[in-house]
Swiss-Prot record:
Organism: Homo sapiens
Positions where N6-succinyllysine occurs in the chain: 84
Gene field: TSTD3
Lineage of the species this protein comes from: Eukaryota, Metazoa, Chordata, Craniata, Vertebrata
Protein's recorded name: Thiosulfate sulfurtransferase/rhodanese-like domain-containing protein 3
Domain named Rhodanese: residues: 32-84
Domain of life: Eukaryota
Gene3D superfamilies, A to Z: Rhodanese-like domain (3.40.250.10)
Coiled-coil annotated spans: none
Length: 97
């Protein structure tokens, strides 16, 4: 597996595998208040990777997009129309990072 710095976003690393390219950001813990402020500012796109049963049991995070973790790689490869149809949200673009 090859790990390299991505050219399109600071702080992201590309891990090139056989089928998909995955991108990870540097992990940063945020408080509830910080997250609430970020969501209110509209300067963040929060992808909630919990499973559907977790959303049903614990509720959806307001202003988040739910894409279960095992679907993230495939979801980010979808065309925008298919993403909108499946997740009922606008697909994030590389420039949103």
């Amino acid at each position: 597996m090859k790990i390299e710095k991505c050219g399109w976003s600071e702080g992201l690393t590309s891990i090139k595998g056989n089928c998909h390219n995955f991108y990870t950001a540097i992990s940063k813990d945020v408080t509830y208040k910080e997250l609430k402020n970020l969501l209110n500012s509209k300067n963040i796109m929060l992808i909630d990777v919990r499973e559907i049963w977790e959303i049903l049991e614990y509720q959806k995070i307001p202003e988040s997009i739910n894409v279960p973790l095992d679907e993230v790689g495939e979801a980010l490869q979808m065309n925008p129309r298919d993403f909108k149809e499946k997740y009922n949200e606008v697909k994030p673009s590389k420039s949103d990072s």
